């Protein structure tokens, strides 16, 4: 199963909009984070309580920041925090419904 979320990450430079794509294989997660013109590889696990534990870089024009992100998923809404050596960033996101994904592909 693959899902896409429209996400907003509250970075030190202000809010950043992007798309988080997640593919589930049991409790294992792979995917990508398309943010500020860069596509970052995502991997992680889905915990028994429904929490997503993701590991990924966030690439910018000046650096690549390794992050650990913990997200709570409730009724198609994501909320959580990314932690890196230099910062903590709050996340919010909403599920992009399959019908909207199909229309945008046309």
Each predicted region: which residue ranges?
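Central antiparallel beta-sheet cores of small beta-barrel/beta-sandwich binding domains
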Residues: 1-75, 79-106
């Amino acid at each position: 199963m693959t899902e896409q979320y429209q996400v907003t990450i509250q970075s030190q430079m202000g809010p950043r909009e992007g798309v988080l794509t997640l593919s589930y294989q049991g409790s294992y997660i792979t995917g990508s984070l398309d943010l500020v013109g860069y596509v970052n590889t995502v991997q992680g696990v889905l915990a028994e309580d429904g929490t997503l534990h993701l590991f990924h870089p966030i690439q910018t024009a000046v650096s690549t920041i390794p992050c650990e992100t913990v997200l709570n998923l409730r009724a198609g809404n994501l909320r959580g925090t990314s932690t890196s050596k230099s910062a903590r960033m709050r996340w919010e996101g909403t599920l992009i419904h399959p019908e909207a994904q199909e229309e945008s592909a046309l």
